[in-house]
């Protein structure tokens, strides 16, 4: 293998590693963020009876209906 071919293989390995790493971080990060938001929201609901509205999520990271908040 020539020097140019080795450099191209190196670049392809770096690119593939970066793409896989970013994809896994993105997918796993969103999943864990949603679980954490739900756990935080449930804990807050237990402490504050005014927040116990079905279908609402008061945590900013939650993707559900935010019950009229801006």
Swiss-Prot record:
Propeptide section residues: 22-51
Pfam families the UniProt entry points to: Toxin_8 (PF07365)
Entries under InterPro entries matching the protein: Conotoxin_a-typ (IPR009958)
Positions carrying Pyrrolidone carboxylic acid: 52
Residues that bear Hydroxyproline: 54
Gene Ontology CC entries for this record: extracellular region; host cell postsynaptic membrane
Compartment list: Secreted
Tissue-level expression: Expressed by the venom duct.
Source species, domain of life: Eukaryota
Signal peptide extent: 1-21
Disulfide bridge map: 56-62, 57-67
UniProt feature coiled coil, ranges: none
Keywords of this entry: Acetylcholine receptor inhibiting toxin, Amidation, Cleavage on pair of basic residues, Disulfide bond, Hydroxylation, Neurotoxin, Postsynaptic neurotoxin, Pyrrolidone carboxylic acid, Secreted, Signal, Toxin
GO molecular function: acetylcholine receptor inhibitor activity; toxin activity
Keyword Magnesium: no
Residues found modified as Cysteine amide: 67
Domain remark from Swiss-Prot or TrEMBL: The cysteine framework is I (CC-C-C).
Similarity comment: family membership: Belongs to the conotoxin A superfamily.
UniProt function note: Alpha-conotoxins bind to the nicotinic acetylcholine receptors (nAChR) and inhibit them. This peptide potently blocks muscular nicotinic acetylcholine receptor (CHRNA1-CHRNB1-CHRNG-CHRND), and has no effect on neuronal receptors. It is able to totally displace [125I]-Bgtx from the Torpedo receptor with an inhibition constant (Ki) of 2.2 and 0.7 nM.
Name of protein: Alpha-conotoxin EIIB
Organism listed in the record: Conus ermineus
């Amino acid at each position: 293998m020539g020097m140019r071919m080795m450099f191209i293989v190196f670049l392809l390995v770096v690119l593939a590693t970066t793409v896989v790493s970013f994809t896994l971080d993105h997918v796993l990060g969103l999943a864990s963020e949603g679980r954490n938001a739900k756990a935080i929201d449930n804990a807050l609901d237990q402490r504050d009876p005014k927040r116990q509205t079905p279908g609402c999520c008061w945590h900013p990271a939650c993707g559900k209906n935010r019950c009229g908040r801006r």
